[in-house]
Amino acid sequence: MGSQSLRAGFLVALGFAMGCDKLALPEHVSPMAPASNPGVGGHLDSGMTFVPSTPSPTDSDGGAGDAGIGSAACAFLTNLDAPFSKSALLTSVAQCTQQQLCQFDPLAVELETKLAAYAAAPSPESLTGARDAWYHALQQWQILEMFGFGPQAPKGDPGGEGLRDEIYAFPAVNRCSMEEQLYDQTYAGSTFDMAPAGARGLGAVEYMLFYTNTDNGCTALNRLNGKQLWSMLSAEELANRKVAYAGALGHDIRAKSALLLSAWSASGGNFAQTLASAGPGGAVYMSEQAALNAVSNGLFYLEQDVKQWKLGRPAGLVECTANCAGYAETRYARVASDNVRANLKAFRLLYQGCGPDYQGLGFDDWLHAVGADSVADEMSAALDAADAAIAQFDLNGAFEQNPGSVAPVYAAFKAISDVLKTDVITVLNLDAPMMLVGDND
């Protein structure tokens, strides 16, 4: 009886999070509504940023492309010193992508393990382990966000299998959709992997582990509120369901990571070879230029997702004029700055090179090869300035207390995207993504 009471008390302390959706939403689901209390979560005090208690198992000596876990198995980079050619650049990109995926997979395994342990025996200790594993997996995935081509891309894109959104759907993470799954207990069924992407993945794990309130984020017209279904669930029952949901998410993320790794591997879909061998008769890309165009589109994650949605919108600089802090990425764990720093590192890996200190072939080598040294130098300076701007900056605190202070960081990232979408794509004869058509920002 005593142990059950302690467990119940711990479970009641667990709660529900906030999300947003840019995809088609179910009727009466509120998209992208700012959180009412974005700083509260788990054992975190209001306003505190989550800091993991353990280092990432993939930590190494700090080299841009080095790995810790599985470093030998993930040693894909074989042509760091190759002279520039389009073919060599595509090979480097393929190897870099495989290396980053190879580093993510053991973190997905660790996340599955820690979430399973938490679901089996909820406690402050198992919660800490689950949170640490989530953070480390998320930070490696923030690197992979820039590699949004091939199997990661949406279905309908060349080689796209839609696997990116299956693992992390930001900014389409949807709190109300998660709460509908909680009420319906779809996480306990065999069709959970068919639930909306905004209710699964790393964004949903954050929701389960960090938010402590027992309210929901759906509109008054949603069935959970309109029919008073949500209020029929006790705080303890809601907490129990969240713990079970977290365990199911771990299995789902691990399965999707395995699919993605296989899609790129020689023993699976071998998309690495598909990318590296682009050209006439290619299975996906009929020319090297077409393949490089797809890769360059990945770089534009920094323009739309980072500059606009991770910096501009929660700061009230674009698309929002009031109560904008709730749009922040990972608003409950409050690690928005870490995410953006990882995104910037990812841009440099893809643009400059995937080796230690960004050695190896990248788009900057292509610029030098065609005599556009000034463009390469301008981008290098912009990257260094953005690194300095975000290095010690607390985005979550700024969004809530002083959103105007984000403007210099936003401007630093805008300088990168301005060079990218004007000089770089013009000189290299690349096409801008469709999302930029008509964009004058």
Regions found by a protein language model. Give the residues of each.
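Mature extracytoplasmic or organellar-lumen-exposed domains after removal of signal/transit peptides
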Residues: 69-441
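Ser/Thr-rich, Pro/Gly/Ala-heavy low-complexity intrinsically disordered linkers and tails
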Residues: 20-72
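Sec-dependent bacterial lipoprotein signal peptides
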Residues: 1-18
